[in-house]
Amino acid sequence: MESQYGTQPPSIAALFVRQARSAPERTAVRGEDAELTYRELDRRSDHLARRLQDRGVRPGDVVGLEADRRAATVVALLGILKAGAAYLALERRYPAERRRLILADSGATVVLTRDDLDAMAEGSAPDPVETAPDDVAYVAYTSGSTGAPKGVRVPHRAVLRLVVDADFLTLGPDDVVLQYAPVAFDASTLEIWGPLLNGARLDVAPERDLAIGELTEHIHHFGITVLWLTAGLFQQVVEYGLDDLKGVRVLLAGGDVLSPPHVNQALAALPGLTLVNGYGPTENTTFTCCHTITAPVEGAVPIGRPIRGTGVHILDADLRPVPDGEIGELYATGDGLALDYLGNPEQTSRAFLPDPFDERPGARMYRTGDLVSRRADGVLDYHGRADRQVKIRGFRIEPGEIEAALAGRDDVAEAAVVAQPGPDGGKRLVAFVTGHGGARPATLALRRELGEVLPSYAVPSHIRVVDALPLTANGKVDRAALTADTSPARPELNAEHRTPAPGIEAAVAQLWSDHLGIDGIGADDDFFELGGHSLVGVRITTDLEREYGVQISPVTFYLAPTPAGLADAVVQAGGAR
């Protein structure tokens, strides 16, 4: 593939500086903590780069960052790049053990905390640094099948290929792009650098979880014109109502399979909207293919064509091209490819292969593990995974990592993790475990201990103890049987079962049953012990808002995570008992 950016500056920071000099007084970023012009963002990131250099950070180093949704975080990202280093975003919600593993694996020389960022607001200009297109811009950790997360090293070239002269999205000075994805999630690469490298404005959403009504109100109030939503969040926004999105020019959605009925509803409600299905793994920098949806869809939504700067091969098991219409595995090529898995040459060599169809020295292709077919017009259709990897709420998960964590427990003999269909149309993780000698591991303790080493999205919604795992005829675990083995039974919980009181308490419990797919929920049952998570919490609070005319923040689930507690919150907010 030919590089698309030609005479453009070779790095993210250099291209940003060009934008800052061309329109210094234009607003660059707005967040709850600050609103900065391009000149101010340039100056503050210079100061932070200088402070990092004074602390011994050198070109090529990795700098860890507690990445909240704040304007100060954007200053830090740019400052790290100006120092010639690569950023490693750390979500504050990550368990301490996972953060420790990631930091140790990355070799980060410095870790910036929220307090550090506030203290580095002033300073002097940094020493100039020459950054090449193939220097590392950031390290993103993904789930690993062996039980350890993998660090993906993404170069500046790959980010520029995504946001400079893109053919799936045009950004300009009149655009306002929302950053809602966590910085550690690769969708933020588009959300942050898309506007800042094209002279647009970046709007950083509040740090807290937002109810759907709060999110759409924010989109309307701050004049968002471009936004990215995961497939699950897109579905919720469509179900809530699209009136607040009438000012949105482009809506990109993906991270999982899009629901055709919701796509069609959005197109009908927002006739001026450009709706794009975006597909791509972290190893190919956010997007590999995009499909602009221009008409109502029947059947599955395609993933489209490769974006500019990207090529694809559809190959069989012997790396031979398959004919149009036949299913093969997707391999990606071009400027978007990551450099490697940090410190993991074995996994790198398995995933990043020499491209046999490109004669240029060093040409590579990335094995995505996704099965696709190509239509006669070049559009690609998605047909699932070739391996066991799954996506839950937009996050890529290797069930093997969870199984390894479970197998490390003394009381677990065997473990298998599968993705089952959830009651809301998405997927949820369910773990099946056996105990030694007929003993029954405590599932509540297992979920709690998994939460200490895995991110919340990788903790199974349910853990079921079985006498034995089912096997196929050749003696392998029958994962298809486990996927089909759904049960609405109430899991083991700390609380004794108490029947909900008639009225709001019973209505809340029923709402939980509907959204969690569990029968017999008690008044004192804990939402998170039942397998609830923030996205389900947002759905429930949205339903309560409609039913009782009150606004309940999703944060309430952390403060009062039971039907009884949530019912009291509804009453206190003005809902009738």
Language-model regions, residue ranges each:
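Conserved small-residue
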Residues: 19, 84, 199, 334, ...
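Phosphopantetheinylated carrier protein domains
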Residues: 274, 409-412, 458, 533-561, ...
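Amphipathic alpha-helical regulatory segments at dimerization interfaces
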Residues: 18, 105, 265, 269, ...
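Phosphopantetheine carrier-protein modules
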Residues: 23-27, 31-35, 53-62, 383-388, ...
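AMP-binding/adenylate-forming domain of the ANL superfamily
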Residues: 1-110, 114-139, 154-156, 161, ...
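Motif- and composition-driven signal specific to adenylation
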Residues: 72-78, 85-103, 126-324, 329-338, ...
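Phosphopantetheine-attachment site and its flanking helix in carrier
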Residues: 46, 70-81, 397-401, 506, ...
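AMP-dependent adenylate-forming
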Residues: 1-2, 9-13, 50, 111-129, ...
